[in-house]
Structure formats: structure tokens, C-alpha cells
Amino acid sequence: MRKLRLVRIPRHLIIAASSWLSKIIIAGVQLVSVKFLLEILGEESYAVFTLLTGLLVWFSIADIGIGSSLQNYISELKADRKSYDAYIKAAVHILFASLIILSSTLFFLSDKLSSLYLTSFSDELKNNSGSYFFIASILFIFIGVGSVVYKILFAELLGWKANIINALSYLLGFLDVVAIHYLMPDSSITFALVALYAPVAILPIIYISFRYIYVLKAKVNFNTYKLLLSRSSGFLIFSSLSIIVLQTDYIVMSQKLSAADIIKYTVTMKIFGLMFFIYTAVLQALWPVCAELRVKMQWRKLHRIIFLNIIGGVFFIGLGTLFIYVLKDYIYSIIANGIDYNISGVVFVLLAVYFSIRVWCDTFAMLLQSMNQLKILWLIVPCQALIGGVTQWYFAEHYGIVGILYGLILSFSLTVFWGLPVYYMYKSKRLA
């Protein structure tokens, strides 16, 4: 009698599956909260809230690249069966210093930065913009620093823990928003920011504090700090340039679009972001797997995994776009009933193209980062940022939301779309 064999599911797929659930919860929270926040704040104040939440991505670099540097060291040391406690301890010291320096700097700069960023609103909102900007910045700095927890857990192939913490923090934030909607329906932008994002900032900090106690006895020397920082600088530069590329649309929106168009664009991007979050969850889980396969020189297996993920990602984006377009009236009515979401089919086609390009580009960017090969990114991403900024500014002036998407697609197509895969193949052949 033939024995039945249980199919062994790869660990990165188990982690990716938990990431999908986590990302769905997070994206769902962000979408559902739109309805409550619009009722609490009103259209113009919610547009300000939306632009402020765009700072979350900017302050993701509050970890100054230490998270990615630490993740790669953990993956490499795990492959060689060596301890990495000293690296975690050193990383916490560096991150604490980063938190203090950035928070102090923003205390003095918030008024000036907010006056440049939040220019298209009423005098009442602009008069309070400095405090809104500072509160948002502090919350997002804590979130950026705390994100190192997720890097550690993914490197240890315990990504499911990271996903639970992340999803739980956003669920708690959503419950806070619902509470102020019913208990304090006329709350300010500050209350809304703290309600939604304070749990997201606090939970990872609590976890990393306990983790620090666990590695407290590890011996750290100057070389440990030096090694972490030498790699982190590359990740910091790349992350900063990537953020400029991906967040230029928020800067352009703040200057070129009306409050109504800002809401249309950001809500639509949140809906599509739900799909893309699912793919980025796969990439996040694959990063340590790719790093270990590279150390073990298993290039054929690595290439096969990447090829299948790109094909699956593009197919998923296409299918998801069709689903959203068919049900768009129903979806938008649930998210924010009463807001005019008259969006042309061209926007949906452009979004499908844009996110398919992102699947391709982000996959190769992840591969190069897992190999610590960042020089090409330093060279090519500034060109992308320049092209993206100029084209989005110009096209948004003439075509509004469609113009921003034209600029995004052009910036990727003319630079990283071809540059990253060419460089990856060149480097992988040399290392093989």
C-alpha cells in the first residue's frame, strides 16, 4: 500500500500567506477608516489628514537603513549558524540615537515645512498646520524606528509574528477612530492622527524593548556599529531616493490638485494598494530566502522563484484591476458615500500598467538589496526621481490625476524597468 506523503509548504510561502492576511487587514482598516474620518473631519480637513499620512513613508527612513542592514546580517549569520545578538543590541542603540535626533530636529522645522507642504487650504487649517505636521512626524518617526522589529522577525523566518503585531496595531488604531467618531465626532486632525497611528507606533517599540532585554548580555564593540552603519548607509540612500520617486505625487498633489481630487486619488491608490500590499508581502518574505540562496550559490533555484513570482504578480494585478473596475461604484459607495468618485476608465488602465511595472521593478530591487548590491540604485534612482518630479508636475498641471500617473509610469519605464534586471543578471553571472 502506497504511503501518503504530506506536501511540505515552503516556509516563505507560509510567512507570505500570513503577510497577505496582515496586509489585507491593514489595507482594509485604512479603507474603512476613510468613511469615519471623513465624517469626523470633513472634506478639507480630511485632505490635510491624507497629505500628512503621506509623511509616514518619508519617515520610514527614520531607521537610517539599520533595519535592512541588520536583516541581511541576521540571514548571513543564520546560514553560517552564528549568533547575531550583538548586532541586534547595537542596532537598538543606533535607532535610539536616530529617534532623539530626528524628533529634536522636527521640533524646530515643523512650522517651516508645513507652510511649504500644506499651502492649498483655508487660513484656519494653515494656522494650525505646524502642530499637525509635528504630531504626525513624531508618530511616524516612532513607526519608522519600530519597523526594525519586522526586519528581525522576517530574517529569523518568524514573519508571522511580525504580521500579527502589525495587523493588531492597525486594528487597535481603527477601534480608536471608531471610538472618537461616536464619542467625539468633532475631533481635530491631531486627535485623528493619534487615534489611528499611536498603536502602530507603540506596539513595535514595546516588542523591541523586550527583545533588547533578551540580548542585553551580548558584547558589542566598535566594529559591530561600524559594520551595521557601513551597510545601512547604502540602504538609507536607496530608500531616500525611492521615497522621493514614490512620494513625489503627494508633493505634486499638495500644490496642483483640489481637496476633492486629492481624496479621489488617495482613496483609489489605497484600493489598488491593497492588491500591491499582497505582492509586497511575498517580496518581504522572499528577501531572507533570496539572501540565503545567494550565500549557498543556488542561483537556478533563485531565478526560478523570481520568475514565477513576477508572472504571478502581473497576472494578479490585471485580475484585480478588472475586479475593481467592474465593482467600482459599489466599492466607492461603501468607502465614502456622498463623495463624487467620477473616475475615467483611463485611470484604471494606467493604474494596472503602473502596478505591473512596480511588480517587475520592486522584485529586482529586492534581489539587489538582498545581495547588498546597491551602487546601481544610487546611480539610476536619482535619474528616476528627476524624471518623475518634472513629468508629474507638468502633466498634473494639464491632466490632473491622469497626469500624475503619466509621470509615474514614465519615470519607471525610462530608468529602473530596464536598468535593474540588466545589472542583476550581470552581477549574478559574476558571482556564480
UniProtKB/Swiss-Prot annotation:
Parts of the chain that traverse the membrane: 14-34, 47-67, 90-110, 134-154, 164-184, 189-209, 234-254, 271-291, 305-325, 334-354, 376-396, 400-420
GO aspect biological process, one term: O antigen biosynthetic process
Entry superkingdom: Bacteria
GO cellular component: plasma membrane
Keywords annotated in UniProt: Cell inner membrane, Cell membrane, Lipopolysaccharide biosynthesis, Membrane, Transmembrane, Transmembrane helix, Transport
Bilayer topology term: Multi-pass membrane protein
Subcellular localization, as worded in the UniProt entry: Cell inner membrane
Pathway(s) it belongs to: Bacterial outer membrane biogenesis; LPS O-antigen biosynthesis
InterPro entries recorded: Poly_Biosynth_Transport
Function statement: May be involved in the translocation process of the nascent O-polysaccharide molecules and/or its ligation to lipid A core units.
PANTHER family, A to Z: O-ANTIGEN TRANSPORTER-RELATED, PST FAMILY PREDICTED COLANIC ACID TRANSPORTER
Protein name: Putative O-antigen transporter
UniProt source species: Salmonella typhi
